[in-house]
């Protein structure tokens, strides 16, 4: 039995071939392929129309939905009551807060959009990039600036006479917006970003 076990161990084992993952691309693969970097470029405007990004709710249909949310929250749009409305939380300023999906949708959508731009920026080395790739890089920086500007509009705490600028953690958040997460920030650091 011992001899059979030894022969089986030698015959049935072998070297493992290392393969690259096929369900995702590495940073090296993205930066070395012109088609891959072009795909990252087109991912940015495509994300603006992304459907069911966060939770699959009927309001989860991309940037246009965020524009609609801002319109109904700021009385820029007449609200018609039909008894069935996917935007009622924002229209009535109800169920808005850290424990509600309506708030989390906006936050998560913006950060996934930032991640999409950071993927493009991180895939291009400006020192060795072609002229076309530098154009892609410029587009990514533009999209990221656009998203951060929108986040500032949505999340900056402004002085008012109804709500204290001191949050539940005891921090004064007057005139603060959101943390800046660039392509160089690690996931661990991003999760710890004040």
Regions inferred by a protein language model and the residue ranges of each:
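Sec-dependent bacterial lipoprotein signal peptides
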Residues: 1-13
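Membrane-proximal, proline-rich intrinsically disordered regions
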Residues: 14-68, 127
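Hydrophobic-face positions in mid-chain alpha helices that act as interaction patches
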Residues: 53-74, 87-88, 177-178, 184-187
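Generic structural "secondary-structure junction" signal
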Residues: 18, 22, 32, 92, ...
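Short coil/linker segments at helix-helix boundaries
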Residues: 154-194
């Amino acid at each position: 039995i011992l001899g059979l076990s030894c022969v089986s161990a030698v015959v049935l084992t072998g070297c493992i071939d290392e393969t690259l993952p096929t369900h995702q691309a590495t940073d090296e693969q993205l930066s070395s392929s012109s088609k891959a970097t072009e795909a990252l470029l087109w991912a940015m405007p495509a994300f603006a129309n992304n459907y069911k990004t966060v939770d699959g709710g009927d309001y989860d249909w991309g940037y246009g939905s965020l524009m609609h949310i801002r319109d109904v929250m700021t009385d820029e749009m007449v609200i018609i009551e039909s008894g069935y409305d996917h935007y009622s939380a924002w229209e009535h300023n109800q169920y808005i807060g850290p424990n509600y999906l309506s708030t989390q949708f906006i936050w998560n959508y913006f950060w996934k959009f930032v991640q999409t731009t950071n993927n493009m920026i991180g895939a291009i080395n400006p020192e060795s990039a072609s002229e076309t790739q530098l154009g892609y890089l410029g587009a990514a920086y533009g999209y990221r600036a656009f998203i951060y500007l929108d986040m500032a509009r949505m999340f900056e705490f402004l002085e008012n006479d109804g709500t204290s600028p001191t949050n539940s953690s005891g921090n004064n958040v007057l005139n603060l917006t959101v943390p800046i997460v660039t392509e160089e920030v690690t996931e661990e650091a991003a999760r710890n970003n004040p």
